[in-house]
Amino acid sequence: MKEKLTHFKVGQIVNTQGLKGEVRVYPLTDDIERFDELKDFYLGKDLNNKLAVEKVRYKGSMVIMKIKGIDSIEKAEKLKNKFMYVSREDSRELEEGEFFIADMIGMEVLTVDGKYVGILEDVLQYSANDVYVVKGEEDKEFMIPAIKKFVPTIDIDERKMIIDPIKGMID
């Protein structure tokens, strides 16, 4: 059984902003406002390198962040292209029926009749609804809309997704 991730990637520092050490962050989360609540984060996968957030603001789809101890453009330059991680405990609380994509990837997908369809490989996020990308046998790829009508059951603990496909969806 796949172990749950302990940390999630929430953004990538892509550039500096100004001369006083602010950085531009490309958010890797579907909830950009989660940065308002961010008190600290890990830089890269080094869980000993925890940095504190001083201030957050937004410019278009980017997050502009001031990090405690980063007070010059030279220090900020050293953070470019690094990924930001938060611990599972510090991630946002999920509503009933919501799951972290990282916990879903790799789960087995079956029909309501018990027929094996494949493995969940990706989740595409669209404004209307998400779409599950399932890799079947012989590298066939199926796109399943993430709505209750087609996906009546997701069992994170058992790592199974049950789908109720219409004709042509998985043929």
UniProtKB/Swiss-Prot annotation:
InterPro entries tied to this protein: PRC_barrel-like_sf, PRC_RimM, RimM, RimM_N, RimM_N_sf, Transl_B-barrel_sf
Any one Gene Ontology cellular component term annotated for this protein: cytoplasm
Boundaries of every PRC barrel domain copy: 96-169
Annotated compartments: Cytoplasm
Highest taxon listed in the record's lineage: Bacteria
GO terms classed as biological process: ribosomal small subunit biogenesis; rRNA processing
Main location: cytoplasm
Pfam families reported in the protein's UniProt record: PRC_RimM, RimM
GO molecular function terms noted in the UniProt entry: ribosome binding
Keyword terms, alphabetized: Chaperone, Cytoplasm, Ribosome biogenesis, rRNA processing
Biological role: An accessory protein needed during the final step in the assembly of 30S ribosomal subunit, possibly for assembly of the head region. Essential for efficient processing of 16S rRNA. May be needed both before and after RbfA during the maturation of 16S rRNA. It has affinity for free ribosomal 30S subunits but not for 70S ribosomes.
Record-stated family: Belongs to the RimM family.
Free-text note regarding domains: The PRC barrel domain binds ribosomal protein uS19.
Subunit architecture: Binds ribosomal protein uS19.
Protein name as catalogued: Ribosome maturation factor RimM
Organism: Clostridioides difficile (strain 630)
Record gene name: rimM
